[in-house]
Every structure is written in C-alpha cells, then in structure tokens.
Swiss-Prot record:
PANTHER family: L-LYSINE 2,3-AMINOMUTASE, LYSINE 2,3-AMINOMUTASE-RELATED
Keyword tags: 4Fe-4S, Iron, Iron-sulfur, Isomerase, Metal-binding, Pyridoxal phosphate, S-adenosyl-L-methionine
Organism: Salmonella typhimurium (strain LT2 / SGSC1412 / ATCC 700720)
Membrane-spanning intervals of the chain: none
Phenotype reported upon loss of the gene: Cells lacking this gene are highly attenuated for virulence in mouse models of infection. Salmonella epmA and epmB mutants share extensive phenotypic pleiotropy, including an increased ability to respire under nutrient-limiting conditions, hypersusceptibility to a variety of diverse growth inhibitors, and altered expression of multiple proteins, including several encoded on the SPI-1 pathogenicity island.
Residues holding [4Fe-4S] cluster: C120, C124, C127
Cofactor(s) recorded in Swiss-Prot or TrEMBL: [4Fe-4S] cluster; pyridoxal 5'-phosphate
EC number annotated for this UniProt entry: 5.4.3.-
Domain Radical SAM core: from-to ranges: 106-329
N6-(pyridoxal phosphate)lysine modified-residue sites: K332
Identification of the protein by name: L-lysine 2,3-aminomutase
Length: 342
C-alpha cells in the first residue's frame, strides 16, 4: 500500500494561498517525500536553471513516500537528463513562437488560442512550452484587447481556446472580463479551456467561477491535463461535479510519458478514474519533441502497441485518440494503430 505524505493543507484553503505556497526547491521536495538524494538526484537539481521547479503541496500529497520513481514525482522533479541535447528536439517543437498578435495563435481554420497567462501552478518537465517567450506574450488586458479585436475581425473563428501557461491562473474577475468580451462577439460559439490547475489545486474551481460559467451563452469545455490515475482524488471529483452541474463539457488529454504511464494497464486505470469523475478521455499525445524532455520519449511503435492493448482493457468510449501535433499542420495528426483489417 502506498504511503501518502501528510502536509497539513486545509481542504478548503483558498487556491491563491495554495498557489503562493508551492515547493520550488528539489531538496525540500525530496525531504517531504522522505527520499534520500543519491548522486543522480543531486546531479539533476541544476536542471532548475533550465526550467524552474514548481509543485503545489496538494499535488505532493498524492505522491508515495520513499519512492523516487513515483509517477507523479517523475513528472515534476528536475533531472540530469534535461541537459541531454537530443537530435530532432528543439525549443519550439510546434513552431508557435511567432504569434499573429501578442498572445494569440491562429493555428487552425476555425479556432484560435489565447495565451491567457504565462505562468503555471506546476511546472511539468515535459512541457512543450518550457522555452516559450512569455515575456513577449504577456497575459494582460492590453494584449487581451488586441487579441479580442483580431477575433472580432475574423468571423471564421467560432471557437476560442484559453491556453497558457495555464489560463486558470487568471483570477475570477479577469476571466469574467474575458468571458464578457467574447460573449459580445456573435460568431464565437464555444470556449475551450485547457488547464492543469483543477487537478493540482482543485480549489481553483471556485463557486464564483462555476456561477459565471453557468451564466454564459457560450458552450464551455474544460480540457484537463492528467497523466496518471494517482493524480485523481476526491477533491478533484467534487470540483468536476460542480462543473458538470452547470453544463460544462469535461474532457482530458494526456501525454504518453516513459516511466509515468507507458503501459496499457496504467492508462486503463487512468481512463476509469477519469470516467468515475465524469471526465471523458479525449487525446493521448505522443511527446512533443521539446529540448530537455527526450528522456520521456515513447516511440511510435511502442505507443501503437500500448494502444492496441488498451483497446482490450476498457470500453471504446474510454479510449483516448492517439495523436501528435506537428508544427504548421492544420490539425492534430492521428497515429494509425495498424489494426488488422478483416
């Protein structure tokens, strides 16, 4: 049985207070988990110079004490492998660093991504935007206004995607302002929010935010970013229940990560945990080839084999679509599972 860390974090603590009390030092993180730093772990600490370590205590509380290979820990702990310069890996794997206006990416025909905030509650070591120039694409009302003018001038945009960073790092009053502006643009029908905050700090789903979503004329979708069943807890389930009650469509996308979820049984457990929380598995992405994350790479052939096995373990509606994102392409690219044809 896993031994879970106790951090004395009040279940009802304000999300901003939790956000201000994240762990940023690898030594403190290992100490909380009662893990002795060996030579390899010590060598990895310098990787925070490449990309800062940042982990909420509520997320640490779901990690197993004494286990340096805990799948949640592996997603956030600095590693010496981040210094490896691997062929084909770059600082801009999706060719995103040239936005049409500051903070707005018009990547797809009918959809645009608004980078609402540059920061995240948790820094995931595999993040494809770990090198993104957020300083040039700051989330503030001035840049948002320019982006909204662009959206209003492009009637083909019927869906806006709030991304980041993490868009739910914006405070409720900021999200209220953005929603109000989007609701005034008649051709915008849907708002899709991609966020990891509801899983790492479930208290982010405030009653005020839920009520604002309930009032909106827009169809609102929340795409959670969850990679392992151990991330899902009761607090997350309660947050999702509140959102379901007001009609928010709940989806999840994962990244296939070596040493975290690279087997069918683990993915089946994740699909079951998500479905129990009212969240539909949506996409399983192969790793974006971002510099510093090559040690998480799972090959396409391995990914196909894992997915073929997953199909035998869960119902079809609980199987996410295996896909990769290719810079410059007009949509995500599904990976053919190479199933036998009758």
């Amino acid at each position: 049985m896993a031994h879970i860390v106790t951090l004395n974090t009040p279940l009802r603590e304000d999300w901003l207070a939790q956000l201000a009390d994240v762990v940023t030092n690898p030594d403190e993180l290992l100490h909380l988990l009662q893990i002795e730093a060996d030579e390899n772990l010590r060598a990895g600490q310098d990787a925070r110079r490449l990309f800062a370590l940042r982990v909420p205590r509520a997320f640490i509380a779901r990690m197993e004490k004494g286990n340096p290979d805990d799948p949640l820990l592996r997603q956030v702990l600095t590693s010496r492998d981040e210094f490896i310069v691997a062929p084909g890996f770059s600082t801009d794997p999706l060719e995103e660093q040239h936005s049409v206006v500051p903070g707005l990416l018009h990547k797809y025909q009918n959809r645009a991504l608004l980078l609402v905030k540059g920061g995240c509650a948790v820094n995931c070591r595999y993040c494809f935007r770990r090198h993104f120039p957020y300083a040039e694409n700051q989330g503030n009302k001035r840049n948002w206004t320019v982006a909204l003018e662009y959206i209003a001038a492009h009637p083909e945009l019927d869906e806006i995607i709030f991304s980041g960073g993490d868009p739910l790092m914006a405070k409720d009053h900021e999200l209220d302002w953005l929603l109000t502006q989007l609701e005034a643009i008649k051709h915008v029908k849907r708002l899709r929010i991609h966020s990891r905050l509801p899983i790492v700090i479930p208290a982010r789903i405030t009653d005020e935010l839920v009520a604002r979503f309930d009032q909106s004329r827009l169809q609102i979708l929340l795409v959670n970013h969850i990679n392992h069943a151990n991330e899902v807890d009761e607090a997350f389930g309660l947050a999702m229940k509140k959102l379901r009650h007001v009609g928010v469509t709940l989806l999840n996308q994962s990244v296939l990560l070596r040493g975290v979820n690279d087997n069918a049984r683990t993915l089946a457990n994740l699909s079951n945990a998500l479905f129990d929380a009212g969240v539909m598995p949506y996409y399983l992405h192969v790793l974006d080839k971002v510099q510093g994350a090559a040690h998480f790479m799972v090959t396409d052939d391995e990914a196909r084999q894992i997915m073929r096995e997953l199909l035998t373990l869960v119902s079809g509606y609980m199987v996410p679509r295996l896909a990769r994102e290719i810079g410059g392409e007009p949509s995500k690219t599904p990976l053919d599972l190479q199933l036998r044809q009758c």
